[in-house]
Amino acid sequence: MFLLVAGATCYFGGNGFGADVMRPLGLRDVRVGGEIGRRIEVTITNNLLVLDADRDFLPPFKAKSADTGYIGLGKLIDATVKFAAYSGDPRVDALRRHLVAETIQAQEADGYIGLLAAPHRVRGMWDVHEMGYLIFALLTDYQYFGEERSLAAARRAADYLVQRWPTLPADWCVGTDVAPHVAATGLERTMLALNRQTGDGAYLDFTLKTRQLPEWALPIVVGRRQGIEGHVYAYTARCLAQLELHRMQPNPRLLRQTERALDFMLQHDGLHITGGTGQCEIWTDDQDGRGDLGETCATAYQLRVYDSLLRLNGDARMGDLIERTLFNALFAAQSPDGRRLRYFGPTEGPRAYWPTDTYCCPCNYRRIVAELPAMVFYRTAAGLAVNLYTPAEAKLAVGKDVALRVRQETDYPNTGRVRLLLDPARPVKFPLQLRIPRWARGATVTVNGKPAAGTVKAGAFFAVTREWKPGDEVTLDLPMTWRLVKGRQRQAGRVALMRGPQVFCLNPAQNPVLAKLDGTELGYLAIDPASLGTPVPSDVVRPGGLACKVSFWKPGFGLGNKADYELTLTEFPDPDGKATYFRLRDFSVAAEDELLAGRDR
């Protein structure tokens, strides 16, 4: 192990070198239900398949007349390819083929794929960013569907960038008003993927020598400054590229930027209770919950970094972070019906939808939702690990290539009961690992109705190793108690209500007596913990979802025994939620955020 700085917490275990301890299943090998599956479905049917790519995405790439600009076509194609692979839906596949064909047709003879006129190419604002994701998407199309023309087009575009790069002036990005790593967000990961796919060392050399990915060591820059160096999305995207390079060329130095980001989020107030980070797309540590909080692009890349670290070392906290983030920050970035998407997800005050289907956040939302099926189950060296609890089915090989089908049955996060039904082709011995969230103290595991051997520890994976036979059943019970989680910095002295991985919020529209109050005014209400009872049904966020009936006192000096209001709190993705933190009469019942346990300060 290593530490980033003296006194910092280390988030990497003993597998600093070598192969991953977990590997994701293929998108075609998993089927997901529950709220995760519903979000996948509505993103496909109510968003992807109803947007107008021929009007909003493709024309600028045919015209090539702009001097600056960004669309997000590469991100759209990448999401469409993955949705097509996962769903097998012929409508999605037709869209994939159309987008890819139109993009390749728009490619110029020299390899350029973009929307800028010749004098502005590469050096123009976001041109490298756009091209990098187009190359990545075409490569994704080849990887999932074997389209040779997509691979050829990706290579031509990458070669164009590699060849043009030496012609750029040293200060080329100054005119873009952003730092060099921000202007080229995503490029290094694209080049590494091309190198792995083709074996062409030119792409690796470009990443190592020209882009100098191993040397990147930018500190956390708090606040929006010239060059926006503290851009969370750009920062985490480059962290992800370093992690992937570490898999190819193991070096502890390549872990340090990710360590730095985790240290800031978990130890120094960079992470909000919903899993979102940063104001105005930039690292911040004051826990301001209003306005432009938690850019969706950053949320998507945080999830990818957590997934990468989970695979690298099997740290259950990364699974906890994935779960917290997707049920709150991520799903709050989408309307419940799937059609509208957000750039930001504040915990206080009004939330706004992005007005178009283009640009980075809507497209990165689609991409990360398309990747969620691969975050449910993971292969381990000897068996299977379950990371996310949701109705799901998977097929894989365990032991010496023994075919296994596994099915999850659960209404999680409504309750904490999860049934796993295992159906191996023949009896086979392997470890089944279950992630036990940090909040789930007192969790129990039974196998065929009998308690599993060993201690079930919150915040770790619990392994059941035995010879599994067709029809074996594992039942996991996670205690789902209410938690009043302490706020920090600007939220100090107040608490947020949580149950399992979910954060709950106050929507004035659901509580007419408060309809005219702003999020700040709502935050002055004091919650009565004694009034917390069994959750009640609510379809505001999802069919079969939950809400909480709870009593509150008005602001004031008295705070008598009888509460002033009985209000309904809804799940955080409620589109009209305006308050998340509330006052508390007796702070002794408040709890620390379990994800931040072990904070240095």
Regions found by a protein language model. Give the residues of each.
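C-terminal beta-rich recognition modules with glycine/proline-rich loops and embedded aromatic residues
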Residues: T43, T258, G319-N328, A333-L421, ...
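Asp-box/WD-like beta-propeller blade repeats and closely related beta-sheet repeat scaffolds
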Residues: A118-V128, I135, L151-V182
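Solvent-exposed beta-strand/loop surfaces of large extracellular or lumenal domains
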Residues: A440-T465, L484-R490
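Aromatic (Trp/Tyr) and acidic
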Residues: G16-P90, A94, R121-F145, H181-A202, ...
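Amphipathic alpha-helical segments of tetratricopeptide repeats
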Residues: Q105, V162-Q163, Q212, W216, ...
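Aromatic-lined substrate-binding rim segments of carbohydrate-active enzymes
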Residues: R91-Q107
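C-terminal beta-strand-rich structural cap/linker in extracellular carbohydrate-active enzymes
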Residues: F430-Q433, V464-P479
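Bacterial N-terminal signal peptides
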Residues: M1-Y11
